[in-house]
């Protein structure tokens, strides 16, 4: 009973469907309204109305309903019976970036009413933003130059305000930030300087748009040496399983296009299994080598593979230098030796319309195979056919689809009718096959339309494309006289073209068949992809449709041409770069050394790259569940219905008109039949799918191949979210070698032309130039990459060591390379100089014959005579000669007949460098004040090494201001030392700003140093927000409490000047807070750098005072809970100190006094200062404090040594405590501070710093605050005179206009006595620096050093050019252990360290860091005790040097710099006269 009832309901539903058709056939009005499913604000959008068989006037209304209300889009009165019209409307900008709304379409007449709603996505019109950098890879310390480009989707420039941009390092630290960036005509050019030691790896430039979306661009920071040449590797893409030999061609070419002399090593390895073949060969005259590598033994013996992959690597080694460069490639060994590629095969078929198939047969190299049989089989039809490929390897088939009963069509195409190697374990070649599946298009009446186009072709812009439309119409067409086909073209989500075609129907024609052509203009607005929909409405209301996608050429309307005035230029010559673009275009130019792109290839800025940007993509809109569409009627499923009315039961793979419309990105409002009948079950609507037909197992295994063209093997990054002189040059002196040559913005004139005159850099290379132009009329334009070869017909290269010691001799070599096809008579000259003697080696120095494409090396044995920097100028000149050059006549090039290279050599005195600085602050009123000074030298001084100069400056910070990045004569390799490069810039900026002396030049320089220091300090940050000496990359398990507090206060103070990511400050503060105990004191984490901070004082007390001070200097109020508890800790600690009156707590008391002063607790500050006064040392008009115990001095001093780091630091804290008095320091505070300042200035070194890092930072803070409080602009001049007991005398005038100027004079008498006199009004800072070298002598020192070379003697032939240096170090001073220690190993002249062996030392437990500078190896040791530490590394000869002098090893305590020791080592062959 229930089943019978169910069947009746189903039949009733079917009848309803037929009644609906009948009603439409009887003349009811038909409506079809099409609108894009995604609508954009502030831009014209179209909605297309198709109203058919109207019998009355109607009004069409469209409105958009959102949570904010209803927006009426248009009201259109329709008077015509039939209407096909598109109406434009504009949606105002949304407050959010997008929202899902309902679009309502209402059609109302006197007797008719149609109303429907559909969900649409409304989006604000978005900009397209991308970033271009001047190059893809940077060295530490270089400037990152980049452009932000902003356009609309039509690629027109936008003047856009971008709220935020920043640079992110590999650790996700935000190291630089900009806000509110305004692009002008679509462009904004910016730059950022990297720190000298940044984190290396991938960096990101991130740009935020107003919508909140962000665009990213990546670049890499790494240490590198630019490759001088490139390696081109050619291997076949694929080979047959029967091939025994792999042909490999490797070529080495210099960046200026000439072949590389040398040899090549080729390695061929299988991917999945072990086994390689290596072949070595010499490069030929073209720089190439082709090798046939036998691979039979490498091929896999397994039988179950389809493809084997072989990796090929070619390493070219340059002759003479040993420089290497590699290139890799892959080749596939395949069992299928030819391929069939589908060029045409639609995804769907239509019953009754032929299904067209076009394939191409290609061989394993991708070349077409003509005159070969190709077989096709269609499983559903039991259809087979064969044809022969034409000359292009093409084969075409047409399959009659009339008799297909199912919903799918499975096709297989074979090269051979039967494959003799179809079983699994076959090792023979297999023949090509390809498969394709097409599914049916749904039509109730079996009527269809089909658009025929070559989908594989790319349509060129600004042309007409013809589309053939085929149709077949069945069913009851009545007395239909004509049929109108309507079409729409969409691109970028909008309707851009519409049209129609009318077909006249012949009386009695059944079925109606035909075809017609549509001509579609290919417009720029269609790039890169357009979709076309065609449909017609049959008399019964059924709609039939088809669609096709067009891939459009990625063209740009702004045609940009870039060219150099010549394709090849001499280095240092003038050239012109000419840009042609749309008038008034703004163009960004770039030219980069090709070597940079060899090192790290990048995606070329091209139209394809632009159209792949995220902002250019069109995503499909799927409504959310809350905006689901109105429920559709459905037919209740029954087996009876399925059996009796199969034409009414669709399969899930069939495609209806609704899907065609949806795939176009359209939404349809209609009362027509465009959708498959939905089968509904008792539990709801479910579309039914027919069982999928599985392909015959005989078709497997197979590989499907798609049409593709490989343009280059070079790896690319994925798309990103990234006037010339007419006079020939006769001589060039080359010294300018940039990596980026051109990075500029120019505007083309009204005729569309711009010319830039520029000088070609000195690098002999190929420059790659490109232009990006933006026009308000034509939008974006890109030039192709334009090369300029900077090349000389011949040039000279000079090699010499970085430095030598006086008395040593070395071989200076000059190699001349001739790349002309003719020979030249050459003359090579080393310019004479009184600074050295040079003896030619060989008898061809004056003149020799240099053959075509040849090279020749001339040598001189050079012995320097002067100390310091010595210039060597080598010139190579082609000369006129009547004598034949070999069998040829010698030629002289028209341009560039002379090449000159100037190089500098540092000549150092032998022995150990010593420096003494005598600094004084003179404050004169009216009476003249004077001071005597004696310069004396030790008996072991090295002859002629002494030099001295006297400096006068008008400001207390002048020296430090000039040397903010060189305050110490020490390395800066750890997190604490780096802060001396950072913090002093804050004090300098504050001081100069308060005293109104800040110039733009000083400000720019200081801000640059702050940004670099900020970047570098992030290297030492731990994941928990703390900081340590060497960061967490060296395995340090915990951060350092003291350093974290130091970084916290410095970052907080720097916020006033540069961008500091607030998260770094917050994380550091949180970590410190977690270290606070219940009593308010702080637990120590990590070791103290300077154990003088202990000095009999409770570590926790001193550390807590320092952290409290740092928190207060970070602008935290004294009432903050953490600070308040910390101050309670200090008050308790002060009580303990008062009770222990016999102990000395000078360092801790100085810190506490400053902390209480910062907190505003004047009483406690005064108490502590009074206690300190009792321990003060008052002498020579100065007041200072000393430590109770001092470390043992390492030698007898000629001069009173500088105070230790801790003593400078605690005296500076006393000054800061006095100057921080509230509301202002009293006259007594200023007077007492002045007395301590006098003592502090005498401790300064020649660069304005002090003994070490922390004392330099604190003392400069004190000096800057004192200078600001006491600053005055005197109208009078201060006169400074220095005179010797002999005839020397020099006067200096200091006034407001030259306060910051360094005035200096060399002192002639060493040894000698001098008098310094100061008269006038005001304070001046005077400094004398004495430097000399002294011979190493045995002395009592705080360290024991033992140095030895391995081998010890020259008996081992390796001792000539490479040997090991072994060191043993122990501490012999008065303390249990040293502070951090630096072992500074100077290189022998002409030798360089083998970097991997130095880096390997960092694996040792006691080595924290190593550095390799120009001429030194620095080894950082955590601390040294009486236990001997041993380590070794290897050095190798770079340039031969004769009469090698010993090199010095210096070991010293970083914070107690008078604790040091020296040793020396010699080459095992130092006395070997054949060392050169």
Curated annotation (Swiss-Prot):
The keyword Protease does not apply. InterPro entries: A-macroglobulin_rcpt-bd (IPR009048), A-macroglobulin_rcpt-bd_sf (IPR036595), A2M/Complement_sys (IPR050473), A2M_N_BRD (IPR011625), A2M_TED (IPR041813), Alpha-macroglob_thiol-ester_cl (IPR047565), Alpha-macroglobulin_TED (IPR011626), Ig-like_fold (IPR013783). GO terms for biological process: embryo implantation. It is found in: Secreted. SMART domains: A2M, A2M_N_2, A2M_recep, Thiol-ester_cl. A proteinase activates the inhibitor by specific proteolysis in the bait region, which, by an unknown mechanism leads to reaction at the cysteinyl-glutamyl internal thiol ester site and to a conformational change, whereby the proteinase is trapped and/or covalently bound to the inhibitor. This is Murinoglobulin-1. SUPFAM superfamilies: Alpha-macroglobulin receptor domain (SSF49410), E set domains (SSF81296), Terpenoid cyclases/Protein prenyltransferases (SSF48239). Residues 713-724 have a biased composition (Basic and acidic residues). Residues 1-27 form the signal peptide. Keywords: Bait region, Disulfide bond, Glycoprotein, Protease inhibitor, Secreted, Serine protease inhibitor, Signal, Thioester bond. There is a cross-link at residues 974-977 (Isoglutamyl cysteine thioester (Cys-Gln)). One of its GO terms (molecular function) is serine-type endopeptidase inhibitor activity. Residues 677-734 are annotated as: Bait region. The keyword Signal applies. Gene3D superfamilies: 1.50.10.20, 2.20.130.20, 2.60.120.1540, 2.60.40.1930, 2.60.40.1940, 6.20.50.160, Alpha-macroglobulin, receptor-binding domain, Immunoglobulins. Residues 710-729 are annotated as: Disordered. Belongs to the protease inhibitor I39 (alpha-2-macroglobulin) family. Pfam families: A2M, A2M_BRD, A2M_recep, MG2, MG3, MG4, TED_complement. It comes from Mus musculus. Disulfide bonds join 48-86, 251-276, 269-288, 461-555, 587-773, 634-680, 849-885, 923-1323, 1081-1129, 1354-1469. It comes from the Eukaryota. GO terms for cellular component: extracellular space. Monomer. Plasma. Its main location: secreted.
């Amino acid at each position: 009973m229930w089943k019978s009832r169910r069947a009746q309901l189903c039949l009733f539903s079917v009848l309803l469907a037929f009644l609906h058709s009948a009603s439409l056939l009887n003349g009811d009005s038909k409506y079809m309204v099409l609108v894009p499913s995604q609508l954009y604000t502030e831009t014209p959008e179209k909605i297309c109305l198709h109203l058919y068989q109207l019998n009355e006037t109607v009004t069409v209304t469209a409105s958009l309903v959102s949570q904010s209300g209803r927006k009426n889009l248009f009201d259109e009165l329709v008077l015509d019976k039939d209407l096909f019209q598109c109406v434009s409307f504009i949606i105002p900008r949304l407050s959010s970036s997008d929202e899902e709304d309902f679009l309502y379409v209402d059609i109302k007449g006197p007797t008719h009413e149609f109303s429907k709603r559909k969900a649409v996505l409304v989006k604000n019109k978005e900009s397209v933003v991308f970033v271009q950098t001047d190059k893809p890879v940077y060295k530490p310390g270089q400037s990152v130059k980049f452009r932000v480009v902003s356009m609309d989707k039509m690629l027109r420039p936008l003047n856009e305000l971008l709220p935020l941009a920043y640079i992110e390092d590999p650790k996700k630290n935000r190291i630089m930030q900009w806000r509110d960036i305004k692009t002008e005509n679509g462009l904004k050019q910016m730059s950022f300087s990297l720190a000298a030691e940044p984190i290396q790896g991938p960096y990101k430039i991130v740009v935020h748009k107003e919508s909140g979306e962000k665009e990213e661009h990546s670049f890499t920071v790494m240490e590198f040496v630019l490759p001088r040449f490139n390696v081109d590797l050619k291997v076949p893409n694929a080979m047959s399983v029967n091939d025994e030999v792999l042909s490999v061609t490797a070529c080495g070419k210099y960046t200026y296009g000439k072949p590389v002399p040398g040899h090549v090593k080729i390695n061929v390895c299988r991917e999945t299994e072990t086994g390689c073949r290596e072949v070595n060969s010499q490069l030929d005259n073209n720089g190439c080598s082709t090798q046939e590598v036998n691979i039979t033994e490498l091929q896999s013996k397994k039988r179950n593979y389809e493809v084997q992959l072989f990796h090929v690597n070619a390493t070219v080694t340059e002759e003479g230098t040993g420089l290497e460069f590699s290139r890799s490639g892959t080749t596939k060994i395949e069992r299928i030796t030819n391929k069939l590629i589908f060029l045409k095969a639609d995804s769907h078929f239509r019953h009754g319309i032929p299904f067209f198939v076009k394939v191409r047969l290609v061989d394993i190299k991708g070349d077409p195979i003509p005159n070969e049989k190709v077989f096709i089989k269609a499983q559903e039809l039991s259809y087979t056919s064969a044809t022969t490929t034409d000359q292009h390897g093409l084969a075409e088939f047409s399959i009659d689809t009339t008799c297909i009963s199912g919903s799918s069509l499975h096709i297989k195409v074979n090269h051979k009718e039967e494959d003799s190697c179809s079983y699994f374990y076959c090792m023979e070649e297999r023949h090509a096959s390809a498969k394709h599946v097409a599914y049916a298009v749904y039509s109730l009446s079996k009527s269809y339309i089909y658009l025929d186009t070559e989908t594989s072709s790319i349509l060129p812009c600004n042309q007409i494309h013809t589309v053939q439309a085929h149709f077949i119409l069945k069913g009851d067409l009545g007395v239909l006289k004509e049929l109108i086909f309507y079409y729409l073209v969409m691109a970028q989500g909008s309707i851009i073209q519409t049209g129609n075609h009318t077909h006249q129907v012949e009386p009695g024609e059944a079925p109606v068949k035909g075809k017609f052509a549509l001509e579609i203009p290919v417009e720029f607005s269609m790039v890169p992809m357009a979709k076309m929909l065609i449909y017609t409405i049959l008399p019964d209301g059924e709609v039939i449709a088809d669609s096709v996608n067009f891939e459009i050429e990625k063209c740009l309307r702004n045609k940009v041409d870039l060219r150099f005035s010549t394709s090849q230029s001499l280095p240092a010559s003038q050239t012109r770069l000419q840009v042609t673009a749309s008038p008034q275009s703004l163009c960004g130019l770039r030219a980069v050394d090709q070597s940079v792109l060899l090192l790290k290839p990048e995606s070329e800025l091209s139209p394809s790259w632009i159209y792949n940007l995220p902002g250019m993509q069109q995503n499909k809109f799927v409504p959310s569940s809350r905006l689901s569409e109105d429920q559709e009627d459905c037919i209740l499923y029954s087996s009876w219905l399925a059996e009796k009315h199969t034409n009414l039961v669709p399969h899930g793979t069939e495609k209806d008109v609704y899907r065609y419309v949806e795939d176009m990105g359209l939404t349809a409002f209609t009362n027509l039949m465009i959708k498959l009948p939905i089968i509904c079950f008792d539990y709801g609507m479910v579309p039914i799918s027919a069982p999928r037909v599985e392909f015959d197992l005989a078709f497997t295994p197979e590989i499907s191949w798609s049409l593709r063209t490989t343009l280059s093997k070079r790896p690319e990054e994925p798309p990103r979210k990234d006037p010339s002189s007419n006079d020939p040059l006769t001589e060039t002196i080359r010294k300018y070698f940039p990596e980026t040559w051109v990075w500029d913005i120019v505007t083309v004139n009204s005729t569309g032309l711009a010319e830039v005159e520029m000088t070609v850099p000195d690098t002999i290379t190929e420059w790659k130039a490109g232009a990006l132009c933006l026009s308000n009329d034509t939008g974006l334009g890109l030039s192709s990459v334009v090369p300029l070869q900077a090349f000389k017909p011949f040039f000279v290269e000079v090699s010499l060591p970085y430095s030598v010691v006086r008395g040593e001799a070395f071989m200076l070599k000059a190699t001349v390379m001739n790349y002309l096809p003719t020979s030249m008579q050459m003359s090579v000259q080393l310019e004479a100089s009184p600074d050295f003697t040079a003896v030619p080696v060989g008898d061809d120095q004056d003149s020799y014959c240099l053959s075509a494409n040849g090279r020749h090396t001339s040598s001189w044995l050079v012995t320097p005579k002067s100390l310091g920097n010595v210039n060597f100028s080598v010139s190579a000149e082609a000369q006129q000669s009547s004598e034949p050059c070999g069998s040829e006549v010698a030629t002289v090039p028209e341009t560039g007949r002379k090449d000159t290279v100037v190089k500098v050599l540092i000549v150092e005195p032998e022995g150990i460098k010593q420096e003494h600085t005598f600094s004084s602050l003179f404050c004169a009123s009216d009476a003249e004040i004077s001071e005597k000074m004696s310069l004396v030298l030790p008996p072991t001084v090295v002859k002629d090494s002494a030099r001295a100069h006297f400096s006068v400056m008008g400001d207390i910070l002048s020296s430090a201001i000039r040397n903010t990045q060189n305050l110490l004569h020490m390395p800066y390799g750890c997190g604490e030392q780096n802060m001396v490069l950072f913090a002093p810039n804050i004090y300098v900026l504050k001081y100069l700003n308060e005293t109104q002396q800040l110039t733009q030049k000083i400000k720019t320089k200081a801000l640059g140093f702050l940004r670099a220091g900020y970047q570098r300090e992030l290297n030492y940050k731990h994941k928990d927000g703390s900081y340590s000496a060497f960061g967490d990359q060296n395995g340090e398990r915990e951060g350092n409490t003291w350093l974290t507090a130091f970084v916290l206060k410095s970052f907080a103070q720097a916020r006033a000047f540069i961008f500091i990511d607030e998260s770094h400050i917050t994380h550091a503060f949180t970590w410190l807070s977690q270290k606070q105990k219940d009593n308010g004191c702080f637990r120590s984490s990590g070791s103290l750098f300077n154990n003088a901070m202990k000095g009999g004082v409770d570590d926790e007390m001193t550390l807590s005072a320092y952290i409290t001070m740092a928190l207060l200097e970070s602008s935290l109020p004294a009432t903050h809970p953490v600070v308040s508890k910390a101050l309670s800790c200090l008050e308790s600690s002060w009580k303990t100190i008062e009770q222990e009156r016999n102990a000395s707590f000078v360092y801790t008391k100085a810190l506490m006094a400053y902390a209480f002063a910062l907190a505003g607790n004047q009483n406690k500050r005064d108490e502590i200062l009074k206690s300190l006064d009792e321990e003060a040392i008052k002498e020579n008009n100065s007041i200072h404090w000393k430590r109770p115990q001092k470390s043992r001095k390492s030698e007898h001093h000629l001069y009173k040594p500088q105070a230790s780091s801790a003593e400078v630091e605690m005296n500076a804290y006393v000054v800061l405590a006095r100057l921080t008095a509230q509301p202002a320091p009293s006259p007594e505070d200023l007077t007492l501070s002045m007395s301590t300042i006098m003592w502090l200035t005498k401790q300064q070194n020649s660069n304005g710093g002090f003994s070490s890092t922390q004392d330099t930072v604190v003392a400069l803070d004190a000096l800057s605050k004192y200078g600001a409080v006491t600053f005055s602009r005197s109208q009078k001049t201060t006169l400074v005179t220095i005179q010797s007991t002999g005839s020397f005398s020099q006067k200096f005038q200091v006034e407001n206009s030259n306060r910051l100027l360094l005035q200096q004079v060399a002192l002639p008498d060493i040894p000698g006595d001098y008098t310094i006199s100061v008269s006038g009004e005001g304070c001046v800072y005077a400094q004398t620096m004495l430097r000399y070298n002294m011979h190493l002598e045995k002395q009592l020192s705080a360290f024991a050093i033992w140095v030895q070379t391995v081998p010890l003697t020259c008996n081992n032939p390796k001792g000539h050019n490479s040997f090991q240096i072994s060191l043993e170090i122990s501490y012999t001073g008065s303390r249990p252990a040293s502070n951090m220690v630096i072992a500074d190993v100077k290189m022998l002249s002409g030798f360089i360290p083998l970097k991997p062996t130095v880096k390997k030392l960092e694996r040792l437990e006691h080595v924290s860091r190593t550095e390799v500078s120009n001429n030194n190896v620095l080894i950082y040791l955590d601390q040294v005790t009486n236990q001997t530490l041993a380590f070794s590394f290897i050095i190798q000869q770079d340039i031969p040097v004769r009469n090698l002098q010993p090199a010095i090893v210096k070991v010293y305590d970083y914070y107690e710099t008078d604790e040091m020791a020296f040793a020396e080592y010699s080459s095992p062959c130092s006395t070997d006269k054949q060392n050169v």
